Amino acid sequence: MFTLGTSLSSQVDPNWQTYIMLVVYFVVLLVIGYYGFKQSTGNVSEYMLGGRNIGPYVTALSAGASDMSGWMIMGLPGEVYTTGLSAAWLAIGLTLGAYINYIVVAPRLRVYTEKAGDAITLPDFFKNRLDDKSNSIKIISGAIIVVFFTLYTHSGMVSGGVLFESAFGVNYHIGMLLVAVIVIAYTFFGGYLAVSLTDFFQGVVMIIAMVMVPIVAMLQLSGLDTFTQTAELKPTNLDLFKGTTVIGIISFFAWGLGYFGQPHIIVRFMSIKSVKQLPTARRFGIGWMAISLLGAVGVGLTGITFINQSGTDIENPETLFVLMGQILFHPLVGGFLLAAILAAIMSTISSQLLVTSSSLTEDFYKLIRGEEAAKEHEKEFVLVGRLSVIIVAIVSIWIAWSPNDTILGLVGNAWAGFGAAFGPLVLLSLYWKGLSRTGAVSGMLSGAIVVIIWIAFVKPLGDVNDFFNLYEIIPGFLTSLIVTVVVSKFTKKPQIDVEADLTDVRRLVKTGED
């Protein structure tokens, strides 16, 4: 157990018991992947969307685990450790955003995607919803998914490399490659079902870890007095409104806007067996999320006192969870906690790889081969989907080979890109009959471009004026929303009867019919 005043480095060397736990964890993932392979290799819909036959509990934890990547276990505790309780605005904004997403987006998207040509990707839904015979919206939205998800997956690869480097002293690149090989294996073979089932398993592992570490840390320190000691070190540590600026609080809170446009999360709503099961999924999923995020904040707060009393500096705050887990627990339990970090990392990577693979297959390859070929040669399209998983993973590894940013920063950029490009479009496509194809394309592009410009040219001016530190999703989301509405007002609407479709969708959601 932990003894105050001793060296961190003398207590964090993993032994064979830690390795055994990790090997067992990897084997479980591969077994689940094999099960998914045996169950869902028949056609593209099954491989990409589980045949729309996923239950509420798997849907909930799959959405949660694919959302709460390595940033929750490594990034958020590190941010709380650095800035104090004010970083909890991020957790508050995300929880509120996820809850609204379940209420506003999930029911209509589940019904409308099936009604609109049984769309299995977001670009496919946009195309059918807007009657886009030119396929321009499908190509552009598909390209945005491929670009931003490749960058998003890159953040997961970085997390995996950092974990193995900090926990085992393993070379960063070897650790990253090990994570990539395992994720590729079960995603390649098992498809959506394997990804969802492994996400469920990994979600259970994650919540146990996030509850366990801060509680044990408190017991090892001074119980609830730990927080008093944390405040004594710096009064702003326990002040929700200090330790950051007003712009910082707004930016943290604005992360919740991103949920409306995250393809790897909202695809979970499309795959649930029935719209009637969504309330169960919502209660279970939001409960899991709130407890996990509370635990992450707890790790950061207890870590402030924990590291201070150990008399040791921490070089990278994002390794706080790793250090606390290895010092506080028996190596076997420490291995379990490392598995929890891997669970967070790999659950997100696998979901992102599958969504990107789906987009490459459905939104690009199908356009080249044609609809008839897709129906006649489904195994060919499944194979293309699997090969796409490998290609995207390789590109992400290449980008992540030389990490030069924080995990939270990498995730934040990709999150903003998707939230701004797709968030307003998803909401308007589900609720507004006046949406046009030209408006949708203009809004998507403007949102993505504003995010990129803000990151590249505006944020570097943050030292001049704090306003420029505003999270890029806010200007990107607002720009996309305004441009979409304004352009739609002056351009041609779809030829199909959208008002009748929206009325039918409302009816189906209300009655719960499949």
UniProtKB/Swiss-Prot annotation:
CDD domains: SLC5sbd_PutP. One of its GO terms (cellular component) is plasma membrane. It is a multi-pass membrane protein. Disulfide bonds: none annotated. It is found in: Cell membrane. It comes from the Bacteria. The keyword Transport applies. One of its GO terms (biological process) is proline transport. Keywords: Amino-acid transport, Cell membrane, Ion transport, Membrane, Sodium, Sodium transport, Symport, Transmembrane, Transmembrane helix, Transport. GO terms for molecular function: L-proline transmembrane transporter activity; proline:sodium symporter activity; sodium ion binding. It catalyses: L-proline(in) + Na(+)(in) = L-proline(out) + Na(+)(out). The chain crosses the membrane at residues 17-37, 54-74, 85-105, 144-164, 174-194, 204-224, 246-266, 284-304, 327-347, 381-401, 407-427, 438-458, 467-487. InterPro entries: Na/Glc_symporter_sf, Na/Pro_symporter, Na/solute_symporter, Sodium:Solute_Symporter. Belongs to the sodium:solute symporter (SSF) (TC 2.A.21) family. Catalyzes the sodium-dependent uptake of extracellular L-proline. This is Sodium/proline symporter 1. It comes from Staphylococcus saprophyticus subsp. saprophyticus (strain ATCC 15305 / DSM 20229 / NCIMB 8711 / NCTC 7292 / S-41). The lineage of its organism: Bacteria, Bacillati, Bacillota, Bacilli, Bacillales. The gene is putP1.
